[in-house]
Amino acid sequence: MRKISILFGAVAVLGILVVGTTAQALELNWVGCGITKKAFMKEVSRAYTEKTGVVITLQGGGATRGIVDVAAGKADMGGSCRHVLMRPEERGVRLIPVGWDALAVITHKSNPVDSLTLEQIKNIFDGMIINWKQVGGPDRMIKVIAREGKISGVGRMARELVFKNPKKDFTSDAKLVKSSGPLEKMAEKTPWVVGFSGISSARKRNVKILKIEGKELSYQNIAAGQYLLFRPLYLVIKRGANQEVKNFVQFIMSQEGQNIIKGEGTVTLKDGSNLWRTYTAQMRDAGTTPGTF
């Protein structure tokens, strides 16, 4: 009888160890834009792993990949800094706003120009303004850098928020790059360039972030809507996602999760609660389909 008791006890202990190991080994994978990763996902996922033991692996690839891979079942979660587009490969996902970012217009640190108007930005990317002296700077040619394609997170949102035209072509003289990372590196190393990025990423680089309409790109100005080029950041999940994904969503939307987001300098949903009406109007002005954002 004693041997049987010992046997059952050993099995019970083994069962506990197996369950514990399974819980520790549980893993979710996330893929998406680098801006979203830097804005919140890196620190939120680290805190979630410490709290629950669930490991979250992070991969880049851009906002479009963050949406498409989740839709195709290749990733549990994604990150995007743009809304869903009406494309077949982007169907079947939910985009959950978790915080607010803003487009940043960046240049080299040595550039004495501090501020641009929206009209000046339009003319620069149209190729109508080609020299920094035309906007109060020195006699140096402007080197425009931009993301390839028109549906990247930064590229799409720049076209909608600044130009009100998602199909807008930038100047043919623009230097095109594959992602925001290389664009930011060019701004760090190359004098007289100008390009769009996201503040959540750009502020961690050695670049100059230009004011727009005299407004600094600060947490307070984004939250108050004073800085005009704000946009939501999204967590992407599959419709009908499993419970582990839903648990993470609950965490990131909780006060604890939002506090982590704020600690990263990203505007929280609460602090940016008054931005939605303006943002919705901006999207409609750009001809964006209601319900996609």
Please provide the spans of the model-predicted regions.
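Bacterial N-terminal signal peptides that target proteins for export
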Residues: 1-9
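Hydrophobic H-region at the start of alpha-helical membrane spans
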Residues: 9-10, 237
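C-terminal segment of classical bacterial N-terminal signal peptides
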Residues: 14-23
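Exported/periplasmic ABC-transporter solute-binding proteins
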Residues: 25-100, 104-293
